[in-house]
Amino acid sequence: MPASSLDELVALCKRRGFIFQSSEIYGGLQGVYDYGPLGVELKNNLKQAWWRRNVYERDDMEGLDASVLTHRLVLHYSGHEATFADPMVDNRITKKRYRLDHLLKEQPEEVLKRLYRAMEVEEENLHALVQAMMQAPERAGGAMTAAGVLDPASGEPGDWTPPRYFNMMFKTYVGPVEDEASLAYLRPETAQGIFVNFKNVLDATSRKLPFGIAQIGKAFRNEITPRNFIFRVREFEQMEIEYFVRPGEDEYWHRYWVEERLKWWQEMGLSRENLVPYQQPPEELAHYAKATVDILYRFPHGLEELEGIANRTDFDLGSHTKDQEALGITARVLRNEHSTQRLAYRDPETGKWFVPYVIEPSAGVDRGVLALLAEAFTREELPNGEERIVLKLKPQLAPIKVAVIPLVKNRPEITEYAKRLKARLLALGLGRVLYEDTGNIGKAYRRHDEVGTPFAVTVDYDTIGQSKDGTTRLKDTVTVRDRDTMEQIRLHVDELEGFLRERLRW
């Protein structure tokens, strides 16, 4: 059976070296995590699979790695300075602080009904309730207290402050002087670096529409209440595509990317039953979006967003371009008085300039890792009554592809053979190959089941020509154990390379 709780996954991640709390020896930094020896391999494998699919295997995509430090004007004209904020509320009794919409989602139905009545919101729509509360914050704080809104930390009704907005961007200063002129931000998303480089990429590659720019990188959001392990954190990684299309073709390409991304996640090992496409209703759409479909996943803590695919129209390039009036921008954008470049596309047939629409598939790397771990976690009862935990990861994503294990660690002939074999398998370029000489083959198998290693190769007495029957007929053969079935076969080392290539290459 899969993980019964998020705590079960967290325990496995720490015990086996996937993910650690950052700065743990100093009490930890809330909402920040470090990837350990196995976690970094899993995360890198996921990113490489995404890059291979979306850049190498396509003829309409270019890559980019934009800087984390972001010019203030980029985030001013994108709208982040004014709108990148979440509603926040405090409990005066416990001194705890919560994001308002998350807090309300956790309330009993009778509490919410009292709030709807108090805020005069007729339709029981949580989004509409939050909007009404933010428009009348003083009234909302009193209504929350009167309605008996519960504090998740104590389980008791709270004494709530008026809700207010909190901008989630991390500020910093570039250079030795901390003044308004040197203000910059750690980027809250990777997308803006793509938009401001649109003309650079277009000029360098001579791309024709439709085409995309792909990027994987860190982003930073000062979340009010980071929670659920690596699901909602303050430092995270994104895999984003900005796919530029002609106006009028945007709805087709939006549908295309929703299906493409759903298919890819299934190919990574997530079951279709756990992936739920969710079409955002108009009241939930971001200010820039014409349409957004979220791919939700059934995490141990609930159904939550794994990836979003948004039709951003011409908002982004229209926000950052010069000559806005001449380009017929359809989205509502700030008047740009600073941009030095025209971020537009010239139709090769008509010679007319226009601002392309953008389709954005945006996935969280950390959420992807969490989904893979949750999906793969399996607790099995064995025929002998014992129990094992196995991570049934897609073999190509597994942190360790092959474990090479000498049957005993006190026979140099066996250990040296195993080391040579490890080097030979590593040269295949299939990923990490681990040599392990713990001396207890049974415990080694269980340990590698738990971290998802698809194949364990054992070097024994037969391998070095010292079979119990006194023959050398099994010389240069090894035992190969399958993680999922626990079945073992014997292969000649010359056959082993082809066997592993067939099962571990993309």
From Swiss-Prot:
It catalyses: tRNA(Gly) + glycine + ATP = glycyl-tRNA(Gly) + AMP + diphosphate. It is found in: Cytoplasm. Keywords: Aminoacyl-tRNA synthetase, ATP-binding, Cytoplasm, Ligase, Nucleotide-binding, Protein biosynthesis. GO terms for biological process: glycyl-tRNA aminoacylation. Substrate binds at R99, E189, F236, E237, Q238, M239, E240, E360, P361, S362, A363, G364. It comes from the Bacteria. HAMAP family: Gly_tRNA_synth_B (MF_00253_B). Homodimer. This is Glycine--tRNA ligase. It comes from Thermus thermophilus (strain ATCC 27634 / DSM 579 / HB8). The lineage of its organism: Bacteria, Thermotogati, Deinococcota, Deinococci, Thermales. The gene is glyQS.
